[in-house]
Every structure is written in C-alpha cells, then in structure tokens.
Curated annotation (Swiss-Prot):
Native organism: Ambrosia artemisiifolia (Common ragweed)
Residues with attached carbohydrate: N37
Cofactor: Ca(2+)
Signal peptide: 1-25
Protein name (record): Pectate lyase 3
Length: 392
C-alpha cells in the first residue's frame, strides 16, 4: 500500500472519529489534534496538507479538473461548485458591458443560472469595470493560466456552492453601482461596491483556495449578513491593512475555517476578525503582523490550532478584543490556543474555556498538525504554477 494511500486512510479515520463524537468536553477537544504517532504518520505524506493531498501530484489534473470538487475541507466541506455543469472557457479579458456581457467573458459565465466550471484559455489580466456578481453553483478555476483580477472584486451575494481557485486579485478599488448582469434574466440595479476583493453576503458553501490577494481599498475577504459554512485555505495574503472580516450581526451561528494560509509582507490586522460566530484557525503561517493577527467582538469562539506566529520586533500580542463589551465581557469569550508555535516573543492571551462543540461544529473541524509543521504545510500558499501534463 502506497504512502499516499496510507495518508488518505489516516485522514479518513480522524474525520470519522470526529463525526462520531456528538459533543466535546475540554478533554475531548484535544482529540481533533493528532497524537505523536499520528503526527509522524501525517508527516510521511510529503509536503501536501490534507486539501492539497486530495488532488495535487497528478499529471492529468487538466483532464480531470473537477476532481478538485471533492477536496473541500472545514466548514465548506461538500462544496462542489460547478462540478455538475459544463466547462465554460473564458476567451476574452474584456468587461466593457456589465449589463449585457458577451459570451466568452468571465462576467457572462459567472451570471448563468446553471452550474458551470469556469476556466481560462490563456494568461489574462481582467480589469473588472464593476464588481462581478457570481451566481449559484460556480467554480472559477485559474489553473493552467496566470489570471489576475484588478479594479473591482467578486460579489457572492445570497448564493451558495461557490469555489474560487488559483486566482490573483489586487488593486481593488471602490466602484459605482448601476445595472449589472447577475443572472440569466435582465440586468438588475446594484449599489456601488466598497472595495472588497471578495465580498460574501448571505452566502453559504463557499470555498476560496490557492488565491493570492493584496491591496484592496476595504477587505480582502469580507463575509457578512448571515454568511456561513465557508473555508479560506492555501491562500497568500500580503500588503494590506484589513484582511478577513467575518461579521454576523446576530447570533445565527456563522461557521468558518481559515486553514493553511500564509499572511506576510506588510499585513496589519483581521486574519480574521470575527463578530459572533465560530472559527477554526488551523495550521496558518502569520509573519510580523501590525496591530494584531486574530481579533473579534461580541463573543465569538476562536480556536487557534497548530499555527505559527512570528511576531515583529514591535508588536507581540497575537489577539485583539474589541467592541463596547470587550473590557468587561471578553474574559468569557472562548479564544483558545492549542499546539501553536510562538516566535520572536509572540504572545497569545487566551480567554474563556475549552468549548463543548455541537455536532455541526465537530463535523467541520480539520485535524490539526503541530505548529512546527506549518512551514511545510503552507509552502505552496497562493496561486500555483500548473501546466497540463505535469503535476501542479
């Protein structure tokens, strides 16, 4: 039996154990973390983390693109994007008619009412004239080309089942509203965008993987207004102040995963910042944040597991607690650290207790490796260079 096969069996076993546990006590919570023997077995899988190990290393990826749809982990697990639809190829960089886009443009494909797996014919720099409204059941797959999105970002509003993979987004600015194509019917009026690279509002089953994001006027990824069940994984975040803002305006139970990402090169805060909700922050690499790395308000649950925190010479504190009740109530917020690695004097001040997880929370947890493994697990964060006929 091959090493790779053994790794899959190990991960499946860990996931099965997770699913069979209805709730976790403080002691039970440690069971999502592998034992020393399990860690040694995981390490033999090579450089791939659990997500990349599902599809990378295969030379036929271009002929079998939709295999990626079986690889989502965390709270986006089960997200298949456009797997059940046709392949749609973007052949034009133009975005000169946002109300009635031409077939062959990214906007035309993203707006269709049917499932689509969207790919790109060649390297492209697409200057979006207005934010791009993405309809249900879409995969935007940049593998095999260098695809850059500039000027306006992606809008994932009140839709579900979306995969964004291997896309570069940078220099995103505020744009006016107007009549914009968002589905098969006539264009609809949309308000202006606030400068997010990826904005999620009321969306669910969203997976953002292997993207490189930098330099937006507002957030790199913002999720609000009832958004839930999304995973941000294997991404590279650089040169930005406000990175990931995950805000629920009531206690409906936002569930999100931040896994295997790298935050470096002049990043300041919100990696993520969570209001209400529950986030697993697992096996990420944080390097020299400005204000803080992990933050939140209004009593969110933050489980930090197996991350690497390399502090700058100026700012050492990993977490930031905010809001009117932060001083009086934050001592009860469940912000916990397990197997994290702290370098150059980095400090994580925990609060609350080890939470008892619901069955739904249990099902979305990714088994964490120790923080010492993070450099390996995040070594390919950001867009990949993928050529047909060779492994990515």
């Amino acid at each position: 039996m091959g090493i790779k096969h053994c790794c899959y069996i190990l991960y499946f076993t860990l996931a099965l154990v997770t699913l069979l546990q209805p709730v976790r006590s403080a002691e039970d919570l440690q069971q999502i973390l592998p034992s020393a023997n399990e860690t040694r077995s995981l390490t033999t899988c090579g450089t791939y983390n659990i997500i990349d190990g599902c599809w990378r290393g295969k030379a036929d990826w271009a002929e079998n693109r939709k295999a990626l749809a079986d690889c989502a982990q965390g709270f986006a697990k089960g997200t298949i994007g456009g797997k059940d639809g046709d392949i749609y190829t973007v052949t034009s960089e133009l975005d000169d008619d946002v109300a009635n886009p031409k077939e062959g443009t990214l906007r035309f494909g993203a707006a269709q009412n049917r499932p689509l797996w969207i790919i790109f014919a060649r390297d492209m720099v697409i200057r979006l004239d207005r934010e791009l409204a993405i309809n249900n059941d879409k995969t935007i797959d940049g593998r095999g080309a260098k695809v850059e999105i500039i000027n306006a970002g992606f809008a994932i509003y009140n839709v579900k089942n979306i995969i964004i993979h291997n896309i570069i987004m940078h220099d995103i600015v505020v744009n006016p509203g107007g009549l914009i194509k968002s589905h098969d019917g006539p264009p609809v009026p949309r308000k202006g965008s606030d400068g997010d690279a990826i904005g999620i509002s009321g969306g669910s089953q969203i997976w953002i993987d292997h993207c490189s994001l930098s330099k937006a006027v507002d957030g790199l990824i913002d999720a609000k207004h009832g958004s839930t069940h999304f995973t941000v994984s294997n991404c590279l975040f650089t040169q930005h102040q406000y990175l990931l803002l995950f805000w629920d305006f009531d206690e409906r139970g936002m569930l999100c995963t931040v896994a295997f990402n790298k935050f470096t090169d002049n990043v300041d805060q919100r990696m993520p910042n969570l209001r209400h909700g529950f986030v697993q922050v697992v096996n990420n690499n944080y390097e020299r944040w400005g204000s803080y790395a992990l933050g939140g308000s209004a009593g969110p649950t933050i489980l930090s597991q197996g991350n690497r925190f390399l502090a700058s010479d100026i700012k050492k504190e990993v977490v930031g607690r905010y809001g009117e009740s932060a001083m009086s109530e934050s001592i009860n917020w469940n912000w916990r650290s397990y197997m994290d690695v702290f370098e150059n004097g980095a400090i994580f001040v925990p609060s609350g207790v080890d939470p008892v997880l619901t069955p739904e929370q249990n099902a979305g947890m990714i088994p964490a490796e120790p923080g010492e493994a993070v450099l390996r697990l995040t070594s390919s964060a950001g867009v990949l260079s993928c050529q047909p006929g060779a492994p990515c």
